[in-house]
Regions:
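N-terminal targeting sequences that direct proteins away from the cytosol to non-cytosolic compartments
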Residues: 1-74, 79-113, 119-125, 132-167
């Protein structure tokens, strides 16, 4: 009777390399983006633009600095969200459908968190996250090509890299 001997390697395969991230550190926020995103020049004061050719998407981050009394924060947030939605309406992309709109206290207690998701008649998806604190309004907007599910997936993959410094 012959005994056969077998050996198996149980060493798991090496994990895939972590995606390369670029870190942008500013006084008001920290931003980590995948290598697909490139900073795009802008003349806008207190604003940064990033473009991903692979995703055909854009990110605009802006900040407006002024003293905001606590009792005026909610009104300021309402105006900020409404003005951004109005700007999309006036962009010439057709009718706008607001899919989500919210203003709530930030979990840190450092201000209010604003958000909306909207889709234009032309199909572009606009996703917005912003903050109102006692000293600023900070805005993160992502504009994506048609396709809500893909846009939301890109936003959800990207926005954890946006870390505002509150207040």
């Amino acid at each position: 009777m012959s005994l056969l001997k077998y050996s198996f390697s149980l060493t798991p395969p090496a994990p895939p390399p972590a995606p390369v991230k670029h870190t942008y550190s500013f006084t008001e926020f920290l931003l980590e983006l995948s290598e697909a995103w490139r900073q795009h020049p802008t003349d806008e004061e207190n604003a940064l633009h990033f473009v991903s050719a692979a995703d055909q998407a854009a990110i605009v981050i802006s900040a407006d600095f002024y003293d905001i009394p606590e009792d005026k924060a909610l009104g300021t947030a309402e105006v900020a969200v409404d003005s951004r939605l109005d700007a999309v309406r006036q962009s010439g992309e057709g009718a706008l459908t607001v899919l989500h709109r919210a203003i709530k206290p930030h979990s840190s207690g450092g201000g209010l968190e604003m958000s909306f998701a909207a889709e234009t008649e032309g199909g572009h998806v606009h996703l917005f996250l912003g903050y109102v604190t006692t000293r600023k309004v900070l805005n993160f907007t992502m504009i994506c090509p048609p396709g809500k599910e893909k846009a939301v997936a890109l936003f959800n993959a990207t926005v954890p890299g946006f870390r505002p410094r509150l207040p």
